[in-house]
Amino acid sequence: MACARPLISVYSEKGESSGKNVTLPAVFKAPIRPDIVNFVHTNLRKNNRQPYAVSELAGHQTSAESWGTGRAVARIPRVRGGGTHRSGQGAFGNMCRGGRMFAPTKTWRRWHRRVNTTQKRYAICSALAASALPALVMSKGHRIEEVPELPLVVEDKVEGYKKTKEAVLLLKKLKAWNDIKKVYASQRMRAGKGKMRNRRRIQRRGPCVIYNEDNGIVKAFRNIPGITLLNVTKLNILKLAPGGHVGRFCIWTESAFRKLDDLYGTWRKAASLKSNYNLPMHKMLNTDLSRILKSPEIQRALRAPRKKIHRRVLKKNPLKNLRIMLKLNPYAKTMRRNTILRQARNHKLRVERAAAALAAKSDPKEAPAKKKPVVGKKKKPVVGRKAAAAKKPAADKKAADKRAGPEDKKPAA
């Protein structure tokens, strides 16, 4: 399937190229902004809502009064009287059966939304540009595998069709009937209460046929399920991007396709059928980033690539890792060896001393004589300061004996 060419082929009612070509309008090259399309769709869809509200009297059409305190029941207003189940039941409150709702809805809610005209046009331009890309159209679920070209343009003769069988034959010749068969297969019953409100069945969307003049084309196509018909001067974002998602499959008549440049203009001239409107421009004229980065202007401003790879090395604890410690301190191995030898030598000395002490204990002759303990008045061993004090007089006596000379020992005359 061909797409995004400067020239678009025009197909006849037989499904073959008629030989005529149309220049691709500039609107199909507009920037695709799904965010703007979704925002505009959401706000415009709100304008179709019908105001609704509950009755102002709902929940208040009874006589009720609170019983007050002291009755071991809630202070909610209660229905008066007796003789029925209703008497004594709570009323008015949103937590009561038969009471009003919380914040009853009002019809003066802000139902409608105003959207800027330029923003609406931007959304339509994005939706049209997306309809020319097969990938986006197929992602939306349209069966366009056999369609010869996108965007698909047919001759103006189609605008004069008045019979549905002619429209069906055209779709089959253009290989677009697969999209209609998808719609038939998707018809099903709606879930929810819409079944009771004249909205029983739902189905998928089919092609969108866009024409310039209605010479019977609306009557011919309107009864085919899934088909949407739009006049090129009244394009609607709700139809071009159902659900706020771009990528609708569009079939154009030749005159409608040629009119797009007058409606939306190009980047060289403004739109002639709209006042003061210019086609939105891309923020990037060239979206090929690889081509931009490889351009000589960019390459001149860039530094040369660093081809040396600096890998992060895991830091290891040298106190736990001997190999790292030897890198930092080669003498650590000798220190560790000396420590081991010293510990072995000290252990050997301790063992020898313990053996000698054990041998001395086992031999009683060689055992040294024990000193007699100092005994007090009550024949109990004296400990601490008392023992030291008891020993001092003996020492003083010995010192006095030593100081006494031979002259002291002479007898008295």
Curated annotation (Swiss-Prot):
Residue numbers carrying N-acetylalanine: A2
Biased composition (Basic and acidic residues): 393-413
Residue segments, region Disordered: 355-413
Keyword annotations of the record: Acetylation, Citrullination, Cytoplasm, Isopeptide bond, Methylation, Phosphoprotein, Ribonucleoprotein, Ribosomal protein, Ubl conjugation
Localization terms from the record: Cytoplasm
Domain of life: Eukaryota
Pfam family of the protein (one): Ribos_L4_asso_C
InterPro entries linked: Ribos_uL4_C_dom (IPR025755), Ribosomal_uL4 (IPR002136), Ribosomal_uL4_dom_sf (IPR023574), Ribosomal_uL4_euk/arc_CS (IPR013000), Ribosomal_uL4_euk/arch (IPR045240)
Gene Ontology biological process terms in this record: translation
Biased composition (Basic residues): 370-383
Record-listed cross-link Glycyl lysine isopeptide (Lys-Gly) (interchain with G-Cter in SUMO1), residues: K361
Name under which the protein is recorded: Large ribosomal subunit protein uL4
